[in-house]
Curated annotation (Swiss-Prot):
InterPro entries: FBPtase_class3, Metallo-depent_PP-like. Belongs to the FBPase class 3 family. Signal peptide: none annotated. One of its GO terms (molecular function) is fructose 1,6-bisphosphate 1-phosphatase activity. GO terms for biological process: gluconeogenesis. The gene is fbp. Its cofactor is Mn(2+). It holds the Pfam family FBPase_2. It comes from the Bacteria. Keywords: Carbohydrate metabolism, Hydrolase, Manganese. It catalyses: beta-D-fructose 1,6-bisphosphate + H2O = beta-D-fructose 6-phosphate + phosphate. Pathway: Carbohydrate biosynthesis; gluconeogenesis. Its EC number is 3.1.3.11. This is Fructose-1,6-bisphosphatase class 3.
């Protein structure tokens, strides 16, 4: 018995108000019937391809290349389409053109002797690639992706079969007219961008867009204009969101990390943060201090900074680190429920002995005891200069329009977790007890765990940024955003402590250790993953948890696929700082209609070499899970929405046919 036969005049009575509204969009039986036919057709198309990336860490060049080449998918399609009919070098040239059309066109025009002939060949090739990547979508969806100025022409080229007699002549006329009207360059660029767009239907970014790398702001520029994406916030994203919300501790941490990795461009050029007051103060305060422990971590071949600038960054790094320790103490004192007293360490320093007595009762020698702005009598009090610097930095952060735009984008398209097509996506952790049960976490005197914890945390982050200054909930929310960065029960962190002070000032490696929460070991167990999937209401025969946050040590043989395929960890080390640790330069998890594939990337050289020499990211593909039957739109979340729409339209048809609602004249 089909769904329509089960609909009767009696069963639709309670839906009449909604059906009356629906009738305005579909005023006749013909309109409603046509929409049902269209939606049923969509249900039987293959699902769109989803790409999952994590822990981009400001590596703009590698990120944009992975988007442009669709993690190697475009190269595979070019090989499938042209096979042995093109030389390897010709296929490489075509791929480079698709990835970087504007730049490649400039190079071609500088060397090509018969440009019109090149245009004819290239346009025909691009049309074939475009036909291939658009074949799994409805014409309506493809049409919505087209640039307006070329929409009609591209549709004609995509939907005409050159194998049919007389059609090739028609296509040839279109192409020759494009060339003769001097629109070939613009048309090629439009086709290449369309190929990129259609190859990735949905992009999921599992957090940590910020930190370490030189250009998180440029990644955000791409994402804010991207056609279909979502973000699951990572700890570094939350840190920047806290800075934009006015949390001085978050600002100090953002600045410290920028100095640590010598990445000032995002702050100064990207967001217009004025670092001059900090630089002036640091150079005066530490004029005779080499600040050896605070030299930025930059690669030897990096010529961005000279020795003088590197020393200045080291001085700024030390200055902001001390300010950070003082600011954090203010929150720890103000929020005893955070239980972070062990992170207040400045008062434990014996400046005469140049030692510190740690919370474990043992005394340790300091690697650096020159802290002229720390008053032993009141070690956590900011000096007048430090307070003035933070006031200026505070104004810089909260008044940056570019930063506001990017953070609003993160709020609009992001959250702590996402459930998508039987996959549970979150960046780091769900706090667990040792026995694998959900851990109760106290927030403002109330207990939260699992899904409720992530939703509460998400609400607090939004309150910190969006609430008015006089909102009584805002001060706690602003403080809690910092806790999410480094607190032991934070689902974005989930370690016993963040040993920042110890890593700078103490040589004992055992004090640097940050003990991970139980989640990170228990997620290897299938039953724990199933419990978490149930907690978040994830349904489906093949359901998974997808995480980032912890780099997968591929070089040591670690497998990113865990818990009998239920858990996928896709932090493969986009950040250059992690390449030696992971042995690779990032993962892309690809979920298409045939199943899951994990694409493992080797380091990206540079955009310049990609354009000039056709150097692509070398990627290897591991099949994770393949379906015996192709997954269609009807098997996805979107498909379930469409089925609901179809059922509503069938109810509207019944209302029309039984006279409960009158058809409207047009």
């Amino acid at each position: 018995m089909n769904a329509y036969n089960s609909i009767t005049p009696e069963t639709i009575q309670e839906d009449m108000r909604y059906l009356q509204l629906l009738s305005h969009s579909f005023p006749t039986i013909a309109d409603a019937s046509t929409e049902i036919i269209n939606l049923e057709a969509i249900l039987n198309l293959p699902k769109g391809t989803e790409h999952f990336l994590a822990d981009l860490h400001g590596e703009y060049e590698a990120f944009q290349h992975v988007l442009r080449n669709a993690s190697g998918a475009i190269k595979r399609k070019v090989n499938e389409i042209f096979g042995n009919t093109l030389r390897e070098n010709e296929k490489k040239e075509l791929c480079t053109l698709i990835y970087y059309p504007e730049q490649k066109l400039d190079l071609v025009k500088a060397v090509e002797t018969d440009l019109d002939d090149w245009y004819v060949i290239t346009l025909n090739q691009l049309v074939r690639v475009c036909q291939n990547v658009s074949s799994k979508y409805t014409r309506s969806k493809v049409r919505k992706s087209l640039p307006k100025e070329f929409s009609y022409i591209i549709q004609e080229l995509l939907h005409e079969n050159s194998m049919v007699p007389n059609k090739q002549a028609y296509i040839n006329v279109i192409i020759s007219t494009i060339i003769s009207t001097r629109r070939a360059d613009d048309f090629i660029i439009a086709l290449c961008n369309l190929i990129q767009r259609l190859t990735i239907d949905t992009l999921h970014v599992l957090g940590d867009i910020f930190d370490r790398g030189p250009a998180p702001h440029r990644i955000m520029d791409i994402l804010c204009d991207y056609h279909n994406f979502d973000v699951q916030w990572g700890n570094h994203d939350i840190l920047w969101m806290g800075a934009a919300a006015g949390n001085d501790c978050c600002m100090a941490n953002v600045l410290r990390l920028a100095m640590r990795y010598g990445n000032l461009a995002a702050l100064e050029d990207g967001y217009g943060i004025n670092l001059l007051p900090l630089a002036t103060f640091a150079m005066e305060t530490y004029a005779d201090d080499p600040c050896t422990l605070f030299g930025p971590k930059v690669e030897k071949e990096d010529c961005t900074y000279n020795a003088k600038t590197l020393r200045m960054i080291g001085q700024m790094h030390k200055a902001i680190s001390v300010i950070q320790f003082k600011l954090e103490a203010e929150i720890i004192r103000r929020r005893p429920d955070f239980e972070m007293d062990d992170r207040m360490l400045l008062h434990r320093i014996d400046f005469e002995r140049k030692t510190i007595t740690m919370p474990n009762g043992k005394e340790y020698e300091l690697k650096d005891s020159f802290l002229p702005t720390v008053n032993p009598a009141d070690p956590y009090k900011l000096t007048d200069e430090e307070r003035e610097i933070m006031n200026k930095l505070h104004r810089s952060f909260v008044s940056s329009e570019k930063l506001k735009k990017h953070i609003r984008c993160l709020f609009r398209y992001g959250c702590m977790y996402t459930v998508s097509n039987s996959n549970l996506l979150f960046h780091a952790s769900i706090p667990l007890n040792a026995d694998g049960t959900l851990k109760d976490v106290s927030i403002a005197g109330k207990m939260y765990k699992g899904k409720a914890l992530l939703e509460k945390v998400g609400h607090l982050i939004r309150t910190a940024f969006f609430a008015e200054e006089d909102n009584e909930d805002r001060p706690f929310a602003v403080d809690y955003v910092w806790y999410l960065w480094c607190g032991k029960d934070s689902p974005a962190f989930d370690k016993d402590k963040m040993a920042t002070f110890e890593r700078y000032f103490l040589k004992e490696k055992e004090l640097h250790k940050e003990v991970k929460g139980h989640y990170y070991s228990l997620r290897n167990e299938e039953k724990v993953c199933d419990m978490l999937l149930d907690e978040f209401g994830v349904i489906g025969t093949h359901r998974h948890i997808i995480n980032g946050h912890v780099p997968v040590k591929t070089i040591q043989g670690e497998n990113p696929i865990k818990a009998n395929g239920k858990m996928m960890v896709i932090d493969g080390g986009f950040s250059k700082a992690y390449h030696s640790e992971t042995g690779i330069a990032g993962y892309t998890l690809v979920y298409h209609s045939r199943g899951f594939q994990l694409v493992q990337h080797e380091p990206f050289t540079s955009m310049q070499k990609a354009i000039e020499e056709g150097q692509d990211i070398k990627s290897s593909t591991q099949i994770v899970e393949m379906s015996t039957q192709r997954m269609m739109v009807k098997d996805t979340d979107k498909g379930r929405e469409l089925v609901t729409q179809i059922n509503d339209l069938k109810k509207l048809l019944m209302a029309y046919r039984t006279g409960l609602i009158k058809e409207k004249s047009i």
